[in-house]
Amino acid sequence: MSDLVAKTAIDRRLADIVTPVIEGMGFELVRLRLMSGKTRTLQIMADRPDGGIVVDECAEISTAVSAALDVEDPIEENYTLEVSSPGIDRPLTRLKDFDVWTGYEARIETTELIDGRRRFKGELAGTEGDEVLITIEDGRDSYVTIGLKFDWLADAKLILTEELIAEMLRQKKASGNFDESQFDEIEESEGEEADEAEQPPTKH
């Protein structure tokens, strides 16, 4: 079964290099993307297994990953390395994510049309085998739970809600890395910016 952590061939190669480094530090790789542009950007999202990663830990991961990439040298051009937390309205990239975040709202997009649509919005209802379960609106005041094969998914992301913010605050407190100032302006914005550490453009 595939996942949404790394989609392209180069992303998967990079993930193979950095995953052991990240996991060896006690974290998990959530998503990896090598973005094009004037200077290429390697974007890495990582988190604690129980959530609550902070910016200092992102910086530590960035340093370790940069050293590993120096050895392997998989990217020919100069690039910038960015390591961040998934943020509150995080992407869902692994089948297990849909179990972890059961009961929270999400948006899911599929690669092909499913019953005439590609986009689904609703409450996550866990998984069943290789299917993601989501409860969606089916007419006025009527809801139905459907199953989407994980391999059909092109993108999936949590929707920012008060319940989700409360859960993220709980994770931060449980991790011992709670900084209330990080959440002061959440109600005034559409989403929470992720903790992030950036390495300057470099050639590895």
From Swiss-Prot:
Domain of life: Bacteria
Cystine bridges: none
InterPro entries listed in its UniProt record: Ribosome_maturation_RimP (IPR003728), RimP_C (IPR028998), RimP_C_sf (IPR036847), RimP_N (IPR028989), RimP_N_sf (IPR035956)
Biased composition (Acidic residues): 181-198
Gene Ontology terms describing biological process: ribosomal small subunit assembly; translation
Similarity comment: Belongs to the RimP family.
Keyword terms: Cytoplasm, Ribosome biogenesis
Xref: Pfam families: DUF150_C (PF17384), RimP_N (PF02576)
Name used for this protein in its record: Ribosome maturation factor RimP
Annotated localization: Cytoplasm
Main location: cytoplasm
One GO cellular component, as annotated: cytosol
Keyword field contains Cytoplasm: yes
Organism: Cereibacter sphaeroides (strain ATCC 17029 / ATH 2.4.9) (Rhodobacter sphaeroides)
